[in-house]
Amino acid sequence: MAKDVSRRSVIAALAAAVPISGARAADAVRLGMLRTLSPAPFYMARERGYFRDAGLDVTFRFFESAQPIAAAAVSNDIDIGVTALTGGFFNLAEKGILKVIGGGLHEEKGYQGSAILVSNQAFDAGLTSVDKLGGHSFAITQYGSSFDYLIGRLAAKAGFDLKSVQLRAVQQVPNMVAAVSSGQVDATIAIASQARPLAAAGQAHIIGWIGDLVPYQLTALFTTERMIQRNEAVVHRFCDAYRRGVADYRQAFLRRDAKGEPVVDATTDAAIANITVYVFTGDPKAREKILGGAGFYDKDAALDVADVKEQLRAFKARDLVKGDADPDSLIDTRFMPVR
């Protein structure tokens, strides 16, 4: 009798340790990105439980510039990343390691996402429009970065001599902005939430907006071929949750009234509360900065495939990407819609 009781006790204990049918531990996903306003839909998706609903435990890993995010994916320090596409990224993608799988922030005409920011000294000396950038110093993070790419696009658009621009690689985005506000460098590119406060404080000048001059796919979602091969279903679930975040972001920040002005209401304020968990935390001007800096995301975070291919072509033309892989082999459209 005692043996039967003992056996029943053991069986009951083991049964209690077994998860209820259908329940399972959440799949861990490490997402690499910059700690800026740009990845706001991911902040919202996490705060609103969309990743949890998809059976995912998403951890954010923050970086100071774009190229290290791609490197972190290669070294298996992150599973998925959202970043600007750089020469370094494309060089890794051409080796079959990385795949672009979805869209992110898109520079779009009429939406002020990234500004051309000029120091007071340079502005006072005559650098008052984009076509006058030739002969001036320009801060970027690294050679082959998205900023390096963009100065080339601006030169082609505005007609100044790219070779006359003195590029200063300062490694990190905050250093770029600081270099201009302190007058150490004449100009740079800064997202609106960084550029507007400096201009309002009289510490720098905005002479143009990237979206109005050269609309392009500013950031994109990517993962590794290894992640796709081993966890394709996880990537699909991640993208589904991300799309929910993008839908909420568009509803909060991209609606326009009959006059074309942004609609700001309780939906917007709820989104701001989610975002300030990660950026502008405790900043009394957080609401103002977020409203002034919210950029454009396509519906469902659709990827601008044609522009990604154009970025690759431009990097190759400047010998910043060495391979000759088919551009279509770098992009996997199974996970997100295309523009």
Language-model segments: what does each one mean?
Residues 68-70, 87-88, 175-179, 194-195, ...:
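Short, hydrophobic alpha-helical packing/hinge segments within bilobed ligand-binding/sensory domains
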Residues 229-320:
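Secondary-structure end/capping motifs
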Residues 106-115, 200-227, 231, 239, ...:
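Periplasmic-binding protein-like
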Residues 320-339:
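Long, low-complexity C-terminal extensions of enzymes
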Residues 25-160, 166-170, 186-192, 207-209, ...:
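Short, glycine-/small- and polar/acidic-enriched structural segments
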Residues 121-129, 226-235:
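Short helix-loop capping/hinge motifs at secondary-structure junctions, enriched
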Residues 1-17:
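N-terminal secretory signal peptides and thylakoid transit peptides that target proteins
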Residues 18-24:
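C-terminal segment of classical bacterial N-terminal signal peptides
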